[in-house]
């Protein structure tokens, strides 16, 4: 029996949603990215042993649906520049680059071990087709000053402190889109952190399509003003507060 294509594998997992996703992405690139993650996983230390057996559903598919949600809700287009912080081997950020109508993508990570392998694959390997629309930034997020339309992150800094770490990266009226699991319960603290760093909560996008891996949602945080005086704080102060909040 011939091996299943990546489209067939994904259709088995999400049979009702796949016909909607299929026309949005370049599936040859999706397959090549999946193959890269499997091939270089041990070298790059991309995933835990348990997750290494679930790369397609827990990482590729989860990221594809995140990207699709932001595109279909109008937050990402060909004219957008998107920065994905703490991207590791390009998750979820690289999947923006495999949209048929792809934005300009900036992959950000201070650790070169994982991301440099993806850069090599794009430069001279199976992902060279996206070379002109993907750029790499090896720097600490809190040290980057830029003007990105959209900044995304899956698991770099606990929410809502991601807003403080990334505020210098997001342009005025730009958006920060954390990809989150369980809802954040301390609404007073959320409002305080967002307000101190110039953000307001514009929208929350639930992702019932990902219930097979757990609860997932996206916050749409719009940067409406400059941070208040004294913000963003030093990285050590932010870390200290996140640890105290998490007990």
UniProtKB/Swiss-Prot annotation:
Role according to the record: Specifically methylates the N7 position of a guanine in 16S rRNA.
Keywords noted in UniProt: Cytoplasm, Methyltransferase, rRNA processing, S-adenosyl-L-methionine, Transferase
GO cellular component term, pick one: cytosol
Positions with a binding annotation for S-adenosyl-L-methionine: 86, 91, 154
Annotated source species: Leptospira biflexa serovar Patoc (strain Patoc 1 / ATCC 23582 / Paris)
EC number, UniProt record: 2.1.1.-
InterPro entries in alphabetical order: rRNA_ssu_MeTfrase_G, SAM-dependent_MTases_sf
Main localization (coarse): cytoplasm
Protein name per Swiss-Prot or TrEMBL: Ribosomal RNA small subunit methyltransferase G
Pfam families assigned to the protein according to its UniProt record, in alphabetical order: GidB
Signal peptide segment: none
Places the protein is found: Cytoplasm
């Amino acid at each position: 029996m011939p091996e299943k294509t990546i489209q067939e594998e994904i259709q088995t997992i999400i049979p009702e949603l796949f016909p909607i996703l299929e026309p949005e992405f370049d599936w040859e690139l999706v397959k090549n990215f999946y193959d890269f993650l499997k091939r270089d996983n041990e070298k790059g230390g991309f995933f835990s042993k348990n997750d290494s057996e679930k790369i397609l559903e827990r990482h590729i598919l989860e990221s594809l649906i995140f990207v699709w949600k932001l595109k279909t809700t109008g937050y990402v287009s060909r004219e957008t520049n998107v920065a994905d912080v703490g991207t590791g081997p390009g998750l979820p950020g690289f999947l923006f680059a495999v949209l048929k109508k792809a934005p300009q993508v900036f992959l950000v990570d201070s650790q070169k071990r994982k991301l440099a392998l993806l850069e090599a694959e794009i430069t001279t390997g199976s992902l060279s087709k996206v070379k002109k629309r993907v750029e790499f930034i090896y720097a600490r997020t809190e040290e980057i000053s830029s003007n990105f339309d959209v900044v995304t992150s899956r698991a770099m800094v606990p929410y809502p402190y991601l807003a403080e770490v990334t505020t210098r990266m997001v342009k005025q009226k730009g958006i920060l889109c954390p990809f989150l699991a369980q809802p954040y319960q301390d609404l007073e603290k959320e409002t305080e952190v967002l307000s101190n760093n110039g953000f307001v909560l514009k929208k929350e996008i639930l992702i019932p399509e990902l219930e097979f891996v757990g609860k997932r949602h996206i916050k749409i945080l719009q940067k409406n003003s400059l941070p208040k005086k004294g913000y963003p704080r030093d990285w050590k102060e932010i870390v200290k507060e996140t640890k105290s909040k998490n007990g």
